Amino acid sequence: MGLFDFLFGKKKQDPSFTLGVVNFFKGEDNPSDLMVVGFVKGSIKVGDEIVVTNMSCVTETPVKTTVLSLGVHGSMVQEASDTTVMAIVRDGTKLGIYKGTVLHSENTPDTELCNAYTVALGIAFVDEQEGKLTKEDCEKLAASDISEIWQLYYRVHAEEAKQFEAKQVLLKYKRREFYKLIREKLFLLDDVYVVYSVETDEPYLFSNASKDEKGSLFVTMPMAQLIPSSYIHNLKEMFGKNENFDFKRIDNGPDKEGIRNFIRDLFIYDGIRGIQYCGEKTTILAEQLVDLPRYKGMDEIEIPVTNPNLIQWLYLARQLGKLNTKDKKTLSQVYLYQFYEALKTAKLLAPMRLHGYDQLLEENPQTDVEPNIPFDLAMQPGQTKELTLRVYTDWKRLRKHYGEDCKALIVTIDEQLAFHDVVINPGDHPMAASTITEEWYNEVERK
């Protein structure tokens, strides 16, 4: 080491440590102090300044306190390394510490924090409490904590549930319990992040494709993935360097209805059947989360036009990106064929401008009968024909581009292709739209 480095060089950082809280008790000498039990990774000493982190609620300003005493196997010690400890934390009762809280040095990497967090949850709620949450646990734990506990519990018990029916029944019961708590807490959050597709600028559809015993391709129900805002700094660890993903914040609003309405719209408009929260093992169907519209007994013309199946297959195809592998090409063919099948019976909305007498469609802005007055449909230059008719799969997408007062003519694809090309959901993102020509439509039909 040179003189400059000796005098002015950076000091070597102290080794990091973590202590994931498995249990806690009020201090005997001072009621504001807290006695915590957990496994320490690294070395912790009496007098150390520690940072208190709840992974479900990461704050911008670190919460700090001091270790007052340490105990290992019933004996008081000044230092402990890589072992289970009992530590008394100054003013710990005021710092929001609960099972799963991580106490750590200031220089601890995020990966070590996450490891300490999951280990603590696993020991506390899977090993010791066997998936049973106390009333206090339910009050303190966040939705993301409960999701993590469920995934740890599932990982431990999934294999034996396949072998024993009683274990399978218990696992399903536990899932219902955990999901009920997640639902209750999810809608009370201030916000949540959603994984979006870079290709479509719409929520990414998480779905898996596999072949059954007969060789037929099976595609799982598409899900949206929701991420707690406290996890947003750790996305690289969760998703790697996947350039197909973007992340957008959903504000729950002052009435706490934003997340609920967002999930409801995913089901109605995008064909997304549910959500994954903090990982694919916490998968909750939309009908278990929100009230969905029921149209039984309504006149068909009164039912708002939606095409979730059409959107689902279009977006799954678009998410494939470049078809540079055999599997991608196969999936593309499957998705586009299913898109075509949905297209054959789809009712679509063509934006319509009436020349006078707008009151004819005041009560219901959609009609399947051409008005007996002059009107225009939205057109743009065609690809194979002179003009392309602009149509939308639902009112939400139509109004985004044409406003709340727009009227629409309900059309089907086959009746239009003889006269025009048709573009579905034209807008700012070409990959979220699809241009249909008569030639393409007939070619797919022949296959």
Stretches with model-predicted labels:
Residues 2-12, 113-447:
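An interfacial alpha-helical scaffold signature
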Residues 13-119:
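Beta-strand/loop-dominated core regions that host nucleotide or nucleotide-derived cofactor-binding catalytic loops
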